[in-house]
Amino acid sequence: MTTSNNVNGCFGDTKLTKVFVGGLAWDTHKEAMYDHFIKYGDILEAVIISDKLTRRSKGYGFVTFKDAKAATRACEDSTPIINGRRANCNLASLGGRLRKSPTMTSPQQGPKNGNRATPPHVGNHSQWYYPSGFTNQQHQQQNHQAVPFYGYPSAYVAPNMTFNQKVGYVGGTYMNGYYAQMQPQPQSQPQPQYYHHHMYGGGRVMVGAASPMVPFYTVYPYHQSQAIGFPQPSFSKPLSFSTPPISGTVGGESIQKKAIH
């Protein structure tokens, strides 16, 4: 048995006699490979290629037979089991077939529209945030109808509510026990709608609209009825003053004046 490390060898033309053996275990020695292929014919050389620095097997080697018929018989079983592991072999002149790791399947992608993937649907919907003690079912039972600020008529403008043209927000103001404050927003963005919510107890509710800037409403406890509106103006007549009748005697003469209303 020849076990030279000279892969090129000096055996003349080995185009039909040299067999490539790949997929070997790392601990496979050339003696184990020789013992497997000796049954096909005389072997001139059997080598396992190893790393020059670590001297560790690279997992493949070569077997050179004495005649081409032996090499052909050895390649009939292209996936032999050597040293307890399935290997692969073929003529070295055809090129080595190193065993590759199984191809990883690419993750499934969502439905595509032509060559472009369909983006997820993003709707212009409002997102609600509830304070503690306020459930989603309570939110669904309420009638979310867009109304002006807490029942005030649209024509009403609070005297202490100012609008800053440069910043673009409505200043904070107290309205019938409520305190409303808007965060600054660019003028080009539409103002969010306001919804009628009656909530008891302290807390903060965030009403989101299709705008990155979200208004904040701080709700204070109140004990008024839900129907909130303007107090009806009441007018009263001026108070009238009356003087009692005056009677008496002046200089012996009796005088009497009537009451003035």
Swiss-Prot record:
It is found in: Nucleus. SUPFAM superfamilies: RNA-binding domain, RBD. Disruption phenotype: No visible phenotype under normal growth conditions, but mutant seeds have decreased germination rate in presence of abscisic acid (ABA) or salt, compared to wild-type. One of its GO terms (molecular function) is mRNA binding. InterPro entries: Nucleotide-bd_a/b_plait_sf (IPR012677), RBD_domain_sf (IPR035979), RRM_dom (IPR000504). Probable RNA-binding protein involved in the regulation of abscisic acid (ABA) response during seed germination. May regulate transcript levels of several germination-responsive genes under ABA. This is Probable RNA-binding protein ARP1. The lineage of its organism: Eukaryota, Viridiplantae, Streptophyta, Embryophyta, Tracheophyta. The gene is ARP1.
